[in-house]
């Protein structure tokens, strides 16, 4: 299918390209995924600034939505995806498979960090549903924070940036900007 972006989608894609640390707040159905994939396509294929992309998402979104979106659009043909889903053995095989984009359920981030150890291979990370990383005590937050210095580009996506308190804002942005704006409290 041919992708004809709206102006705001074009702006979103360019924003991701221009800003290695970005948070995208767009409502449901506004095209966060396609805008982000278009930026990834440009960064991987045209600018050669990114080698391996990791998408962290709810399990169904990681398994179904991102691969389907990648296969849906003509301009993304040729980008490859490997969903890191299933048993530990299946996840290990998927993580070791050659691909441009890897998708994983957020509950498996501690496993992935342990699996790769000091050889973290993903130079770009996309957190689909950034608001799910608001608890700095959660294992997934701690694991991602551990490898954050090895990540060159990070994008947080959400349609619902609705914090219950100021502390709910801190953790997601600690991951995005590595504590530059709101501090490194945890």
Report residues per predicted region:
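Interdomain motor-coupling "hinge/lid" segment immediately C-terminal to the ATP-binding subdomain
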Residues: 159-160, 174-186
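PAPS/PAP-binding and catalytic site of the sulfotransferase fold
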Residues: 37, 69, 165-176
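Helical "lid/switch" subdomain of P-loop NTPase nucleotide-binding domains
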Residues: 137-147, 161, 165-169, 180
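Conserved helicase ATPase motor motifs in RecA-like P-loop NTPase domains
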Residues: 27-29, 151-166, 174
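SF2 helicase/translocase NTPase motor core
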Residues: 1-150, 184-186
């Amino acid at each position: 299918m041919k992708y004809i972006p709206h102006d705001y989608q074009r702006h979103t894609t360019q924003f991701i390209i221009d800003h290695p640390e970005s948070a995208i707040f767009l409502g449901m159905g506004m095209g966060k995924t396609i805008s982000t994939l278009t930026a990834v396509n440009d960064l991987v294929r045209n600018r050669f600034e990114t080698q391996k992309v990791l998408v962290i998402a709810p399990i169904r979104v990681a398994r179904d939505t991102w691969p389907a979106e990648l296969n849906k659009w003509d301009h993304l043909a040729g980008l490859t995806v490997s969903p890191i889903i299933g048993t530990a053995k299946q996840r290990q095989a998927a993580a070791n498979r050659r691909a441009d984009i890897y998708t994983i359920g957020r509950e498996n981030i501690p496993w992935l960090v342990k699996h790769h150890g000091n050889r973290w291979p993903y130079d770009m990370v996309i957190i689909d549903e950034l608001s799910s990383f608001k608890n700095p005590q959660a294992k997934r937050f701690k694991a991602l924070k551990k490898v954050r210095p090895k990540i060159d580009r990070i994008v947080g996506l959400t349609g619902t940036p609705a914090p219950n308190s100021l502390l709910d804002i801190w953790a997601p942005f600690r991951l995005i900007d590595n504590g530059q704006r709101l501090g490194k409290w945890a």
